[in-house]
């Protein structure tokens, strides 16, 4: 196995009223607010074909996560037995990549308004992908 490192460059940041990961919803459908994805101008051409109403998968880097954690109580509830992080949606994990299903509300230049996003303000954006139908 090749363990060579590699670099990911954020393409933008989240603007959200959420500021504390501890009090943010665990999933967007659990009360995640509308938020803005603010993209770097260098990637704006990549938005071609994205429209209001489109469902997207947003990939983020959960920069406040603890990358040393390998076992957690699911949903941070100590009444739940400990599990390995790869069997949970915990942000704490060796490579804290966030996966967020969102819907585009509006697009204003480099700013995309999306619904139901549980990511906190300032979270780096790695990528956006369309949700595709069944093949």
Model regions: which residues?
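Glycine-rich, low-complexity intrinsically disordered segments
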Residues: 1-101, 105-135
């Amino acid at each position: 196995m090749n363990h060579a490192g590699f670099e990911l460059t954020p393409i933008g940041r989240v603007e959200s009223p959420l500021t504390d990961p501890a009090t943010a919803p665990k999933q967007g459908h659990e009360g995640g607010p509308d938020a803005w994805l603010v993209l770097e101008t260098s990637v704006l051409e990549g938005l071609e074909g994205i429209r209001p109403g489109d469902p997207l998968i947003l990939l983020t880097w959960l920069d406040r996560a603890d990358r040393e954690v390998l076992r957690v109580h699911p949903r941070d509830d100590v009444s739940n037995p400990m599990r390995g992080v790869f069997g949970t949606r915990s942000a704490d994990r060796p490579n804290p990549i966030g996966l967020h299903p969102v819907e585009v509300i509006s697009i204003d230049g480099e700013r995309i308004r999306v619904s139901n996003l549980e990511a906190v303000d300032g979270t780096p954006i790695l990528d956006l992908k369309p949700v595709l139908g069944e093949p």
